[in-house]
């Protein structure tokens, strides 16, 4: 069986930056998961004593607090800054961008439409910088929503571009003025395009990443559209021998929060599978 890697996959700029910040801040805490990859979070704890905390009340005075890549709501950031702690901001710059955009557009009187998952930490952070934002995942969710005649729209950095286009087209058809900010990350574009291309050539796709990672789930969705035998795994232990029976080309891609050491372990384990 031939194993092919996608042309673009794995750690993005924002995640690499956040991991470096955490490694250079031993004995610190992260407010929320730094990235959506449990294996890497466990490694940071074991090797650098970087602890995960979910609530501000859990943070001790004089702590060093690393802000997660997804950012946090501005109210929580303000509360942190009121405490006697050192705040180290590892928010991805590509996530900070939509925060700044919705803040400015709200001040200028635009209705704000955010394309993304309202329960995702990145979107919760972006929402906090906007006035009465409307968050949707589809045109159907947008229909009937109260909007001014001038609208500004941003997207979650890890969503599918084609789905964002549908939102934008709907707004352009129904509103007089629409300011469109394409805030989907370039790394997301590249990884998705590479996954799409490879999944058309493979008869099995393995997508490596956290099951709670938005960008990894998008990769899985894209691969599944082209290759029905697509599987999302967090690590090599989740591989099943029977998946590979009769397969000739195994394609591999990985989410933006997936470290190389996990990808290499998965590849080595696939090589050992004899079917």
From Swiss-Prot:
Transmembrane segments: none annotated. [4Fe-4S] cluster binds at residues 12, 92, 185. Keywords: 4Fe-4S, Iron, Iron-sulfur, Isoprene biosynthesis, Metal-binding, Oxidoreductase. (2E)-4-hydroxy-3-methylbut-2-enyl diphosphate binds at residues 36, 70, 120, 157, 213-215, 257. Isopentenyl diphosphate binds at residues 36, 70, 120, 213-215, 257. It catalyses: isopentenyl diphosphate + 2 oxidized [2Fe-2S]-[ferredoxin] + H2O = (2E)-4-hydroxy-3-methylbut-2-enyl diphosphate + 2 reduced [2Fe-2S]-[ferredoxin] + 2 H(+); dimethylallyl diphosphate + 2 oxidized [2Fe-2S]-[ferredoxin] + H2O = (2E)-4-hydroxy-3-methylbut-2-enyl diphosphate + 2 reduced [2Fe-2S]-[ferredoxin] + 2 H(+). Binds 1 [4Fe-4S] cluster per subunit. GO terms for molecular function: 4 iron, 4 sulfur cluster binding; 4-hydroxy-3-methylbut-2-enyl diphosphate reductase activity; metal ion binding. It comes from the Bacteria. InterPro entries: LytB/IspH. Its EC number is 1.17.7.4. The active site is at 122 (proton donor). Dimethylallyl diphosphate binds at residues 36, 70, 120, 213-215, 257. CDD domains: lytB_ispH. Its cofactor is [4Fe-4S] cluster. Pathway: Isoprenoid biosynthesis; dimethylallyl diphosphate biosynthesis; dimethylallyl diphosphate from (2E)-4-hydroxy-3-methylbutenyl diphosphate: step 1/1; Isoprenoid biosynthesis; isopentenyl diphosphate biosynthesis via DXP pathway; isopentenyl diphosphate from 1-deoxy-D-xylulose 5-phosphate: step 6/6. GO terms for biological process: dimethylallyl diphosphate biosynthetic process; isopentenyl diphosphate biosynthetic process, methylerythritol 4-phosphate pathway; terpenoid biosynthetic process. It holds the Pfam family LYTB. HAMAP family: IspH (MF_00191). Belongs to the IspH family. Catalyzes the conversion of 1-hydroxy-2-methyl-2-(E)-butenyl 4-diphosphate (HMBPP) into a mixture of isopentenyl diphosphate (IPP) and dimethylallyl diphosphate (DMAPP). Acts in the terminal step of the DOXP/MEP pathway for isoprenoid precursor biosynthesis. This is 4-hydroxy-3-methylbut-2-enyl diphosphate reductase. It comes from Nitratiruptor sp. (strain SB155-2).
């Amino acid at each position: 069986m031939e194993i092919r890697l996608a042309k673009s996959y794995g750690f993005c700029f924002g995640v690499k930056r956040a991991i470096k910040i955490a490694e250079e801040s031993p004995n610190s805490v992260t407010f929320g998961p730094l990235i959506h990859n449990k294996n890497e979070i466990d490694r940071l704890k074991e090797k650098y004593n970087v602890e995960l905390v979910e609530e501000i009340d859990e943070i001790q005075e004089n702590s060093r607090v690393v802000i997660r890549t997804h950012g946090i709501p501005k109210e929580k950031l303000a509360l942190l800054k009121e405490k006697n702690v050192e705040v180290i901001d590892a928010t991805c710059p590509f996530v900070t961008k939509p925060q700044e955009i919705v803040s400015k557009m709200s001040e200028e009187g635009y209705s704000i439409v955010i394309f993304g998952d309202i329960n995702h930490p990145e979107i919760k952070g972006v929402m906090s910088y906007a006035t009465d934002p409307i968050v949707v995942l589809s045109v159907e969710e947008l229909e009937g929503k109260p909007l001014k005649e001038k609208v500004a729209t941003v997207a979650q950095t890890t969503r599918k571009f084609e789905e964002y286009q549908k939102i934008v087209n709907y707004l352009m058809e129904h509103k007089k003025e629409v300011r469109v900010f394409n805030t989907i990350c370039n790394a997301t574009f590249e990884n998705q395009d590479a996954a799409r291309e490879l999944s058309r050539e493979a008869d099995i796709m393995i997508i490596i990443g956290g099951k709670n990672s938005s960008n990894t789930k998008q990769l899985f969705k894209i691969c599944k559209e082209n290759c029905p035998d697509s599987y999302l795994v967090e690590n090599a232990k989740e591989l099943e021998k029977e998946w590979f029976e009769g397969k000739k080309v195994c394609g591999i891609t990985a989410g933006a929060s997936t470290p190389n050491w996990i990808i290499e372990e998965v590849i080595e384990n696939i090589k050992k599978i004899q079917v």
